[in-house]
């Protein structure tokens, strides 16, 4: 391909890979100037008919899916006994490389990425297309930082009411049901993979990881992972629901769309045709292409029968979408539409009015087939004879096919070699040379090497290999600046001129890999080149950075729609303190019943904090004594989560305190403050349980899954306070309204530095037993 300067209407330019014959080339349309990437399939005529059919089936899927968050297939051209696939140009490269450079992302950026992935994936699921190989290596960034899903080599059509059988994907991202070899729901498995990506974006590492593949698979099947304590409760809850081992109880796409962590985003309204009437007449050419997708090329009669039936079937939907591409509007119809547009524009101009594109489309009633111009649309430049048919007639030869991912299913023509066909070792690849587009270093490359077992799996650790730094030509993809590339930039277009296209790949430019950063104001500044690399994870939250117009930075810590920040809290355990700000607005009523699987451990919200700054305005921040202020000692604090709403939880706490007061435990001075929604009381020195005196406060806060009671020690014995808070937790558990997330945490939590008496030896045990007998 190095001697080819053009393919059809596309002028070839820089090589995006290693420079070999299988490397992708940056291309520009001769007349429209559109940028694209041309990927060759060398030896196409030497493939068997079944191998060609599988590759063509993937191309049909790519052509069917038209969504802003899915990589766009532009054209397929045959020239010089080769097949050239023209796909969308993605200046941002892979999300994987961006994660290697940046490490972890803020919750705001993570939510934006996750929402875009889910939007594209939901559109595929509506077409009954399951991706089955979602991972950061298969997600790409455009010039504006938007994510697009690519690599549909393992995608499959899942008929309604049926399950998939083939085990495929990468073990780090594959769902437990795929690893265990069971029949599975492809949509639920894709949601699991999105949960792994969600975790990696937030933390910079994978939730399930091990050098031993057997241990890794066991971890995935058990679903046990360490939940980071420095993320919001909403993010934790969504992670638990997405990484549910039981696919039948795993959160669905509809529930994810309504989850508070993502409720601030507006769901795009992209319609999909649902057809019940029989297709008449049936085009044999379209059926031939659909038979590649449904893998029934040998016997297409069942496909004809379904198209002629009276039921709304997925075959009819895909037939309708494919017919729009194979049979675009005639030139006469296009000319009539253009005449109507000119007439409308002339009338509007005479009246001193201006019409936008949406008004024009509504006036002439022209359906929009694609979100942006593509070469096979009616208004595009006609293709030459070499690309008149998007697919070729299968040719049976005796050639070899050395890039199949198993014995029956060859890999994607656009797919990276890191993907495996089943749960076998597949580690994230190292940094690849070139611009890391979705088309370089494919499985067609002759110099492909298996993934190394030492490939990095922690995205927070930068790669310090000098050879890797010299081989990478992509510029640093900092989230604040590098998504500003414009395809219409004169400097870019000038470099892509046909006369300036180099015949080979020039010397690689020196790449500066990202290092651990230091935070200065609202910018992230890299250390000098000579500084030593620090492998420790460091997180910085740029509070004033505006990443998306759809997100309100002032309200995003609690991502509800129209949420407002009105409260803050500081929590601490005897092992250290943790500062945490959270919005305490009322949550949707539908989330009172959301539960988290009991077998997972809830990480403590009280891990040590890197800041000592006080959070003003907290409704339950007590006064500190002179010694506490002198030694910067914070009071003990503990949270108990309940499924009740805040008002009901307040009533239950007051009822327990008053009952204890009647039993003679020594409870006194019970005061309810309706302004701060807190209850204060104390245990007197003279009490029937010989407890040390203590003064405490209980603040009730609304959460999206119910409410929480925050117990704060104001003065007195921390041991008595610990018994008191634990007793409330046990009472809530006995009454059945302790939140499952909190229940699993208390059951699995390790011993704390402060000694805690057992439940049976607790001073409150006798009264709890008496209350159980009475109830």
Curated annotation (Swiss-Prot):
GO terms for biological process: cell division; cellular response to glucose starvation; mitotic G2 cell size control checkpoint signaling; positive regulation of G2/M transition of mitotic cell cycle; positive regulation of protein localization to medial cortical node; regulation of cell cycle; regulation of cell size; regulation of extent of cell growth. InterPro entries: Fungal_KA1_dom, KA1_sf_fungal, Kinase-like_dom_sf, Prot_kinase_dom, Ser/Thr_kinase_AS, UBA_Crd2. ATP binds at residues 16-24, 39. Residues 10-262 form the Protein kinase domain. Residues 549-563 have a biased composition (Low complexity). Residues 549-620 are annotated as: Disordered. It holds the Pfam family UBA_Crd2. GO terms for cellular component: Cdr2 medial cortical node complex; cytoplasm; medial cortex; medial cortical node; mitotic spindle pole body; nucleus. The modification Phosphoserine is found at residues 309, 311, 476, 587, 632. The active site is at 133 (proton acceptor). Its EC number is 2.7.11.1. Residues 584-593 have a biased composition (Polar residues). Keywords: ATP-binding, Cell cycle, Cell division, Kinase, Mitosis, Nucleotide-binding, Phosphoprotein, Serine/threonine-protein kinase, Transferase. Acts as a mitotic inducer. In G2 it negatively regulates wee1, a mitotic inhibitor. Also has a role in cytokinesis where it required for proper septum formation. Belongs to the protein kinase superfamily. CAMK Ser/Thr protein kinase family. NIM1 subfamily. This is Mitosis inducer protein kinase cdr2. The gene is cdr2.
